[in-house]
Amino acid sequence: TTGVGLPLDGPSGNVPTPHPAGSPNGYQPPYVAPELVTRDYGPISTMDPWLPANATRTEGNNTFAYIDVARPNGFGTGDVAPTPNGDPDGGIAFDRVYDPLQNPYANDSQRMAAATQLFYDINFLHDWYYDRGFDERSGNAQTSNLGRGGIENDPINAEGQDNSGR
C-alpha cells in the first residue's frame, strides 16, 4: 500500500506489468512482501467504518466479499467468506497472506486471502470515490445510507472466483 492505503497493482507492487518489454522475454517482477493494513475506514471524510464492531466475516455496509465456489450463484453452502483471525489490540483483523506460488484454488487459506484483498479494494474505492462526489444520492452502494438520501440496501456482492460461468 501507499501512505494513504492505496492498494498496489498486485503482489509485485506497482512495477511495470506485465513486463517492461511488452512481449514475453522471461522478465519476472520482484515480489513485494504483503503488509497487514490496519484501518477502520478508508480515505473518506465521513469516517464511516467498513465493518460493524461485531463482524464475523468480510461483510460490511459497502460490500460483502466472498469466494463463490459452489452453486447456486451467490453466497451459500460451500462458499468461503473470511472470518476474523484475531487482533492483538482487541479489534477485528483479517490477517490473511496470499501465496502467489500456490494455485488460487489450492485451499481455503488462499481463498480467504483473495476475498480479504477484494474486501479491502472494494471498500477503499468506495471511500475514494465518495469524497469525489459519488455519494448516496449519486447511487453509491451501501446497505444503510445513514440518513443521507439515495436508495439503500444495495451493497456490492463482491464474488471472487465466481462460479456462475461469466
Show the residue positions of the predicted features.
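Extracellular zinc-dependent metalloprotease catalytic-domain scaffold
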Residues: 1-166
